[in-house]
């Protein structure tokens, strides 16, 4: 089973304006949405779109927590949240105007007893399970929580995926996470230098592998993504051009796609595919299967796989190639016509 953990889930209240936000004035929206999320929940949502079962873990509180839990159940997500006695699940306000402005809630305080309940749930995980830890740690929790959880699971064979930043990510590397997914700027922070170009990004990813990471998947916004796998391979995919409607959840979708394609040939997911969303066709940023871009990567079992380009599907038919890198050589581009469904 795949388990995702969202320590501080949220209800995102997304407000759209048709002009710039005027601070200190009354601004009238032209549209609004409520999106239930948090990074781990976003991952579970994309996994569901790919036909993969998962269980979303985390903490909820108050009426907003109950509303979030009901909403996720209505979307078909399986949850096993820990219910807190005090506080309320946070509401984040996202203002979409000429520029994006965010006001994120603090969320409830998480007592040590609640964290212990989560640890006890994770104690039941085995080598057949995948654990995805994503996002920041609330200020009320120990900042070494990620380390504690991975140390607790160390030696059990659980494949741990970590999507976090700075010390949260750096400090779990000794526990050999199966996958980490920094973006290129976060990767630069981890190695202490600005990264320009694929060669520098690849070298930095390998530095993190030397520190313990098995697979390093680097998201690069409009420049696509780069994967350095545990077998030493380097794989590059571009990103189709288009108007960015909402970038929220793009990295979470990439994590979900890697897990669905690399680890579990389940449901309707292609057996060795990792998706990436097209922001131009994904109004809420995540959870739309037809907007997932797929590229083939090596399966854990080690069977023959040419890392061939796997066609992508976008609403507007845009297609981008897959670059196959060879040690010391130039990238090879493999193209293909887009397929439609």
Where is each model-derived feature located?
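Glycine-rich phosphate/adenosyl-contacting loop at the front of the ribokinase-like
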Residues: 1-57, 65-67, 243
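Conserved N-terminal subdomain of the carbohydrate kinase-like
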Residues: 23-25, 49-129, 296-301
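Short, conserved phosphate/pyrophosphate- and ester-handling motifs at nucleotide-, phospho-/glycolipid
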Residues: 47, 183, 251
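Gly/Ala-rich phosphate-binding loop of Rossmann-like dinucleotide-binding domains
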Residues: 48, 154, 263
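Short beta-strands and strand-loop turn motifs
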Residues: 102-104, 128-135, 163, 181-186
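Conserved phosphate/ATP/ADP-binding segment of small-molecule kinases
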Residues: 143-231
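Conserved phosphate-binding/catalytic region of the ribokinase-like
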Residues: 170, 198-306
């Amino acid at each position: 089973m795949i388990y995702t953990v969202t320590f501080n889930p949220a209800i995102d209240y997304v407000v759209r304006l048709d002009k710039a936000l005027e601070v200190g004035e009354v601004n009238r929206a032209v549209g609004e949405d409520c999106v239930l999320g948090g990074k781990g929940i976003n991952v579970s949502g994309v996994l569901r779109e790919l036909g993969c079962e998962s269980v979303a873990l985390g903490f909820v509180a108050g009426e907003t927590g109950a509303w979030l839990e009901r909403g996720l159940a209505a979307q078909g997500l399986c949850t096993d949240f820990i219910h807190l006695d005090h506080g309320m699940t946070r509401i984040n306000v996202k203002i979409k105007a000429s520029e994006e402005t965010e006001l994120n809630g603090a969320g409830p305080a998480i007592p040590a007893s609640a964290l212990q309940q989560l640890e006890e749930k994770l104690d039941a995980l085995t080598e057949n399970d995948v654990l995805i830890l994503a996002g920041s740690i609330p200020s009320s929790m120990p900042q070494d929580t990620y380390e504690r959880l991975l140390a607790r699971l160390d030696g059990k064979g659980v494949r741990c995926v970590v999507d976090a930043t700075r010390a949260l990510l750096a400090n779990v590397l000794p526990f050999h996470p199966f996958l980490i997914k920094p973006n290129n700027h976060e990767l630069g922070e981890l190695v202490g230098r600005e990264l320009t170009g694929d060669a520098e990004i690849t070298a930095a990813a390998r530095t993190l592998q030397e520190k313990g990471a098995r697979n390093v998947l680097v998201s690069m916004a409009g420049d696509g993504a780069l994967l350095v796998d545990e077998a030493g391979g380097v794989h590059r995919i571009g990103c189709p051009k288009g108007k960015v409607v909402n970038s929220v959840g793009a990295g979470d979708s990439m994590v979900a796609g890697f897990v669905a394609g690399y680890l579990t040939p389940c449901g309707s997911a292609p057996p060795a595919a990792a998706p990436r969303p097209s922001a131009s066709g994904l109004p809420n940023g995540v959870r739309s299967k037809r907007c997932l871009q797929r590229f083939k990567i090596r399966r854990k079992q080690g069977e023959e796989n040419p890392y061939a380009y796997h066609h992508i599907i976008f609403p507007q038919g845009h297609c981008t190639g897959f670059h196959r890198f060879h040690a010391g050589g130039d990238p090879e581009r493999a193209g293909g016509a887009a397929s439609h469904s």
